[in-house]
């Protein structure tokens, strides 16, 4: 991975990340393709309509179905899904923790039951790297020890200790495998934990950033804390992260969250919000959110967002989308998803332009002004 | 509507139908867009990926939701849906008859309750023309009196009598409105009834074809009768239909049904089969049907049909589609629908080529040979 920090506007950064499969310009929002499909879209949509240079897939989901060995046989993620740009895969730890009825973290890893058939599985730091080798993702994530909040300080301390130990095991195994020619073109990121406690975040960031990872993520946020707690935690944690490597804030967030965290020095984001909300009827626009099922749109001939250049806004009226939503037509899901992801990706392109011109503060002010 | 009979190959016909919105080359299969959306596709798919020159919408459904007056305000079907080519709308009689809990046909029309909210409605021959004026379809269908089979000869005779009476009322009203400038660019087809009884079909066809309709449909087939009964009924009925007007077989059918009925002189078809079966996992190919959920496709790197030029076959493997289907990914529905409709529309293009070369019998033999 080649990383170039091109410009800053105060703490906001415009970078370029070059993987074996694409050149990613940051700030970047990565659409979520849990099962190797960005929900409701096909890969031509992702490429031609959205121009996404990187998407996510979930290790937990692909491991269970169709199975990472099947994916490997079918040409890894790139061959199987036909998406030729970059994939980032999470470690599966979060899903093992949150989707499984039983999930037990021990010193060696996380035991869980499949949410599909109840079968028992055990994820270890090495095991999730093996799986991600099979998936062939451009950026893989380490297994981290997650804690259900609220938790005692003792439990959080244990989580950080374990995450650091697993990170050491992960990076040693990953680099050793690379020397053997396995995953030579892949990259690996560590995940900083510590909740909203600054001392814990300092400790976790300091320990992990001393290791030879290709990039670093901030995990464990956007789990119910106040927005300001999230922003403060990011602002604090970023200080302990290297300037010459990518910074990824996992599972965040609203357009406002993106704007705020870019200002605090984050380069990469992912979230199910634009895709999931699209399916539920919530569309993001330059003037705020719009719930397309509202009766007020029944005979509204305007596009969702007159400033938007997406297929949906260029072609269809709110009235037609309102009708498709109310009639539960499948076509609605794709059109709404295209719009929301286009909005997110375009917002990132505009943020980048502003950083390159060192006008991020003005850009942010204008972003909020339009929302009134 | 301009109708040109270009070529025949025995009884099979290649025609051109020119409406105010498109030039339709027959034999033609019309994708079903019940609610103004071909399920799982958007109109760019229908235009650019399928090249469809005519699609269906259902009067019953559009009347109930969003309402034909809303559609009229939003620019009729063409403006509302953005599909710029031809629309055919049925009369709503079939849905009023089949989707409603209560449905009573009387001398004057059909009373029914909405399947959405239970509200009471009454369709008359004039009322469904008024609705179709609001929808702005290029081809509208008359209200016909449907009979649940099996029925007594007496009831079928009454159905034919009523359908003829309603047809007379319809064509008078439609032409009168045209003189007033309403529906001047629209066309209207009558629907021949009579089950699989040849005497009844003769009577219905003779009576209706004496009237000034723009085309004629054969209704009341593909309702559970044997294939040969359907084919025999079509073969018989076609003899009483004019050569210089389009012939439309409603609600039919499988690829085999299309091939057989083209041979018997049918020009136009519609059916939910390619779209509905796609969603259920059944894909149509040049070598027969394929159920994509089968475990045998889990690691099958081939396209669905190696002879197919659709987006789905050019880009994706059976393995990926199998995975999307099994994972219930929304993207599956669109990719499968694109394939099945592409197959149907392409089959019609090939049939047309064969007719133009007067080689329909050879084409049909080859069609069956490939299926083994």
From Swiss-Prot, chains A, B:
SUPFAM superfamilies: tRNA-guanine transglycosylase (SSF51713). Pathway: tRNA modification; tRNA-queuosine biosynthesis. Its cofactor is Zn(2+). Residues 251-257, 275-279 are annotated as: RNA binding. InterPro entries: TGT, TGT-like_sf, tRNA_ribo_trans-like. It catalyses: 7-aminomethyl-7-carbaguanine + guanosine(34) in tRNA = 7-aminomethyl-7-carbaguanosine(34) in tRNA + guanine. Substrate binds at residues 90-94, 144, 193, 220. One of its GO terms (biological process) is tRNA-guanine transglycosylation. Zn(2+) binds at residues 308, 310, 313, 339. It is an enzyme of class 2 (transferase). The active site is at residues 90, 270. Keywords: Glycosyltransferase, Metal-binding, Queuosine biosynthesis, Transferase, tRNA processing, Zinc. Its EC number is 2.4.2.29. Catalyzes the base-exchange of a guanine (G) residue with the queuine precursor 7-aminomethyl-7-deazaguanine (PreQ1) at position 34 (anticodon wobble position) in tRNAs with GU(N) anticodons (tRNA-Asp, -Asn, -His and -Tyr). Catalysis occurs through a double-displacement mechanism. The nucleophile active site attacks the C1' of nucleotide 34 to detach the guanine base from the RNA, forming a covalent enzyme-RNA intermediate. The proton acceptor active site deprotonates the incoming PreQ1, allowing a nucleophilic attack on the C1' of the ribose to form the product. Homodimer. Within each dimer, one monomer is responsible for RNA recognition and catalysis, while the other monomer binds to the replacement base PreQ1. HAMAP family: Q_tRNA_Tgt (MF_00168). This is Queuine tRNA-ribosyltransferase. It comes from Sulfurimonas denitrificans (strain ATCC 33889 / DSM 1251) (Thiomicrospira denitrificans (strain ATCC 33889 / DSM 1251)). The gene is tgt.
